[in-house]
Amino acid sequence: MDNNEKEKSKSELLVVTGLSGAGKSLVIQCLEDMGYFCVDNLPPVLLPKFVELMEQGNPSLRKVAIAIDLRGKELFNSLVAVVDKVKSESDVIIDVMFLEASTEKLISRYKETRRAHPLMEQGKRSLINAINDEREHLSQIRSIANFVIDTTKLSPKELKERIRRYYEDEEFETFTINVTSFGFKHGIQMDADLVFDVRFLPNPYYVVDLRPLTGLDKDVYNYVMKWKETEIFFEKLTDLLDFMIPGYKKEGKSQLVIAIGCTGGQHRSVALAERLGNYLNEVFEYNVYVHHRDAHIESGEKK
């Protein structure tokens, strides 16, 4: 058995954690539908024992997802140490997925569901203080996560689609590159590893016929690409990424989020994200996905 076959034969454990209200339950449901054995709210101290069960070769435990949250704050404090211990001592492949969202979005979700945040201590603390406290306590586990997903602007359907892309096809290369366009006026892409600001390029918004269109339309795309500044920028951008991406892969990173921003996220960033996605698909044998976060907002199209 070669090394690749050995890797494929190993059991896989995905720890799903993150901010309360960011989508952990939805992710666990999605993974369960995809054939994962799922466990909700396992105390971190029991993680090594669970891994021992997985090492016994039970076929039903070959792909496992465990949701762990901050409800048992004292127990949660040991999670980073437990994960590091399992990674160093076990043959089980362990990844950590961290889900987050903006404070404003989390407050909105709690108001919609009328549920209490687990750290509100039966109403003794405000919701915003509970969220901020949780964010601070989770900063360490976030720093070791293989996947960080910001669900602020993701619908439940979009979150499920992203999870399926990452985990559904075992034959795919495990390293994933997500290229996202966004508009600075709608907020920066919070889960981005690399952010590139293209607001210095000529803006199609000021061409009346192009204003209602997006960078997905041929006329807008051609307008953005016809400028010398665009060609110079794209050449420098791809030269930089050609150098950086193999380094990220070598260091064990599972995903890379590249965000390209313009003013509204409708024209320049969309066109360049499309071009960059095509380039990366041609140059690298990795999973490359392109997403346009804000194009529908400015153009008035339905999402």
Swiss-Prot record:
Function noted in UniProt: Displays ATPase and GTPase activities.
Residues binding GTP, per UniProt: 69-72
Residue positions binding ATP: 18-25
SUPFAM superfamilies in UniProt: P-loop containing nucleoside triphosphate hydrolases
A matching Pfam family: PapZ_C
Alphabetized InterPro entries for the sequence: P-loop_NTPase (IPR027417), RapZ-like (IPR005337), RapZ-like_N (IPR053930), RapZ_C (IPR053931)
Keywords for the protein's UniProt record, in alphabetical order: ATP-binding, GTP-binding, Nucleotide-binding
Descriptive protein name: Nucleotide-binding protein SAOUHSC_00787
Keyword Isomerase carried by entry: no
Domain of life: Bacteria
Family: Belongs to the RapZ-like family.
GO molecular function, one term: molecular adaptor activity
